[in-house]
């Protein structure tokens, strides 16, 4: 289990021409969705995360078009479950930053995942990425954000 750490994150959101004036290659939010599973642990299979699957589907994930993913899993088991729920293929680069296993900044972890994907798109290291945030000890709440470059 990852160590809990202090930390923070800030992301600048801008639309259209303003975004283009701030950087050469903006990372555009193409889809975002948040879903919640039951917090009662006895009512679902803990080897799955249905809310993560649904959030990814509604955000617009298509596994053949995801270059990289930053997943907020605080254990390697959670990362494995989430990779499966998102339908990531073998070519998708996962948690190049080290992910939340390296350090879990709790409430900033999701935004950090988004900033990591955006940073790689802005620097032309990727064209399309998935950023994920979760809350709850058993992946009960899941947010998926799909970002793309131009």
For the regions a language model picked out, list residue spans one by one:
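Claisen-condensing/thiolase-fold acyl-transfer catalytic domains that form or cleave C-C bonds
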Residues: 1-150
